[in-house]
């Protein structure tokens, strides 16, 4: 049978040793493709969330001097670290980065005022806004949209092909669309599940 396990850890390093595959909002990157194979199932960008009304006047184009919450092991954590380096190089105030093992902690940090903004994949931002019942709002629009995927042990073509066929069946028979609509994220729908799609 299938065993599932929800864990607050970096999943990709455990694919192929501890787990056969990982299902999360994995952003496909060339670097990650060196470690695992991917089957795309969704497209998502990145986004920011702030307290409703943006009381701290956060500007997404200038995060220097702010407290920014992110989830550990995400592309957003990498990106905010690069932004922080640029702030320092430009002689601006430092970004205080609050990395959390769970996204719920990053969300809570903004709701409680411990962080000015959180940075996450766009579906995560949308879900957090819905779950906090109006306490948060998205800052600006989604950006840098890329495919999200299921991660599978590198070179395990049998499992990779089985996952691709299963995802494609769900897309073709309408089940996938119904699931996305239920969660309010149908704007990220793909019509083709691809194995290791090209990324920029």
Model feature map: region roles:
Residues 1, 5-7:
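Short, small-residue-biased leader/transition segments that mark boundaries at the very start
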């Amino acid at each position: 049978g299938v065993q599932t396990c929800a864990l607050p850890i970096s999943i990709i390093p455990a694919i192929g040793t501890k787990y056969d595959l990982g299902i999360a909002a994995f952003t496909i990157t060339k670097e990650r493709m060196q470690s695992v194979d991917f089957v795309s199932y969704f497209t998502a960008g990145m986004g920011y969330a702030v307290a409703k009304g943006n009381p701290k006047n956060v500007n997404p184009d200038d995060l220097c001097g702010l407290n920014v919450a992110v989830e550990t092991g995400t592309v957003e954590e990498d990106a905010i670290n690069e932004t922080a380096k640029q702030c320092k190089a430009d002689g601006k105030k430092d970004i205080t980065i609050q990395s959390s093992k769970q996204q719920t902690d990053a969300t809570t940090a903004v709701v409680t005022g411990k962080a000015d903004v959180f940075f996450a994949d766009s579906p995560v931002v949308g879900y957090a806004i819905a779950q906090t019942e109006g306490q948060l709002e998205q800052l600006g629009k989604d950006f840098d949209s890329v495919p999200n995927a299921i991660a599978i042990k590198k070179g395990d073509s049998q499992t990779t092909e089985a996952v691709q066929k299963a995802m494609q069946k769900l897309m073709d028979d309408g089940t996938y669309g119904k699931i996305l609509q239920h969660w309010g994220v149908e704007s990220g729908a793909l019509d083709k599940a691809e194995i290791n799609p090209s990324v920029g």
